[in-house]
Structures are given as C-alpha cells and as structure tokens.
C-alpha cells in the first residue's frame, strides 16, 4: 500500500528469473476510492494494511496510528476479489464496482496494524475489536470479539521514559496457530489473549510485562512471536515498545496515517 491510498503490484524478475534493472508496475488500484464507491460515503481514514488470503482475494483495512474513537473517523475493512486482480494482471478491464466489497466500521473504529490471513479467512484487529472475516460474495463477519483498552498511553512527568505508545487499542497484528488467534489488549496490565479461531471465544488470558519497575508503562506494538509445537503447547514472546510513539500523535491535527518518522516516532527513543 502507498501513502496516497493505492495498492501497487510490481514485477521484479523477467521470465527467466533474472532481476529486472527497473521494476515494472503491473497493477495500480486506488483502494480508498473503490471502497468509498462501494460504501457510498466518504472515508476519513486512509489505507493502512493489505494482505492476500488463501483464495487470492486482497484484503485491506483503513486506519493509522492512534485511532481515537471520540474523533469518529469513518473506516472500513474489505477485499478486492481475486477475479478482478487476475483480470488486471492479464491486461483486461475489471469492473471494481462489482469486485470491491466492504464492511463498514462504527465511526471511530479503525485498524492500527497489519492483517493476518488463515485458511478460515482474514483476521483483523482494530482499536476496539478482533474480527474474522471471510469472502463470500461480500464480507462475511464470522465473528467479532471486543477487548479492553485504557486508550492512548503517554509518558508522565515523573516517568523514566519519553514519548508513548503508538496505538490507542491493542496495537499488534494478530498471530495465528491452526486453532488460535493471539494478540495483546491495551488494558492495565496488558494481557495476552488467545481466541478460538472458529468461534472468536477468548480461551486464555494472561497479564504480560506486569513486573516492570515503577515509572515504566507497557505498549505492545508488534505481533507476539508464537511457536506451536503441534503437541498441545503454544509458546509466545511479547515485547514492550512503549516510548516509541511521538507525543505529537495526540495532536488532533496530526494525520496518523502518514508514514513518516517525524510524525510517528519519538526521536529520543530512536537514539537510545
């Protein structure tokens, strides 16, 4: 995805497998415009993440960093049908009005990280809920599971950190096993959650990073590292990224979907 809401596909090698000196653009779709046409209203969030599912459909999510619910920005989750992508790659015309499908989010809800694909569908974590979505001549919401968040976290006057968290909600992309969806919430303390892939039911919940010294907060901003030994044991590693976020993310005039270090990251954190 690009910062102007397009998704591009580039050809990197020739038919013999040699790397091209200059990549060739073979697909360019304005996803935000296509999603607005499908939704019938304007989106006030920008394109954040894309991923292919197991059937070749291209899923997308709008959002950014620190999607504040009270600002009521309009966002969507959705996909472009595999058939349309194949048509474009074959040099044919594709009618996106019949190939782009969206799931309208409540104003103020949006994605803050990546999308995970499984054989069951696309798993997307917004600032308020975790979804399993499936392409079925439209977006089928198989399940939607809410989770806790205390909201955006920033350093206090006596804290031993600067900056804050990058997300308002859970902040991490979902990690998958064949049976589970795993991510952290943004409660206090932060908890690692495991959801049943089929039902979305929370089957395990455990506080993590809850033994830090006073003056340190927790914000998980990347996927949990997950290892499934296929014998009934799943192991995880969760990392604390608190302090990475720029204090400027709290500014209502900041467009948190703009991917730039100056807008997103705390410079003190980058230099340590």
Regions of interest found by a model, annotated:
Residues 6-46, 51-272:
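Extracytoplasmic/lumenal domain signature
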């Amino acid at each position: 995805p690009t910062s102007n809401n397009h998704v591009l596909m580039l050809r990197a090698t020739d038919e013999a497998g040699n790397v091209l000196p200059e990549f060739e653009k073979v697909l360019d779709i304005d996803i935000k415009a296509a999603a607005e046409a499908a939704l019938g209203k304007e989106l006030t969030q920008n394109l954040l993440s894309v991923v292919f599912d197991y059937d070749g459909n291209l899923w997308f999510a709008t959002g950014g960093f620190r999607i504040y619910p009270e600002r009521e920005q309009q966002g969507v989750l959705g996909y472009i049908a595999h058939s349309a992508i194949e048509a474009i790659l074959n040099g044919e015309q594709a009618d996106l009005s019949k190939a782009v499908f969206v799931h309208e989010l409540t104003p103020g809800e949006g994605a803050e990280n990546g999308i995970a694909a499984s054989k069951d569908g696309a798993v997307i974590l917004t600032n308020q809920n975790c979804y399993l979505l499936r392409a079925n001549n439209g977006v089928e919401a198989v399940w939607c599971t809410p989770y806790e968040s205390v909201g955006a976290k920033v350093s206090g006057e006596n804290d031993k950190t600067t900056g804050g968290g990058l997300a308002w909600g859970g902040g991490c992309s979902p990690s998958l096993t064949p049976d589970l969806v795993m991510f952290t919430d943004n409660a206090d303390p932060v908890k690692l959650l495991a959801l049943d892939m089929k039902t979305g039911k929370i089957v395990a919940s455990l506080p993590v990073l809850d033994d830090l010294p006073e003056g340190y907060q927790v914000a998980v901003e990347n996927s949990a590292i997950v290892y499934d030994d296929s014998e009934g044991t799943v192991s995880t590693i969760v990392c604390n990224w608190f302090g990475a976020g720029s204090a400027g993310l709290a500014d209502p005039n900041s467009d948190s979907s703009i991917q730039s270090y100056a807008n997103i990251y705390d410079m003190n954190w980058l230099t340590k």
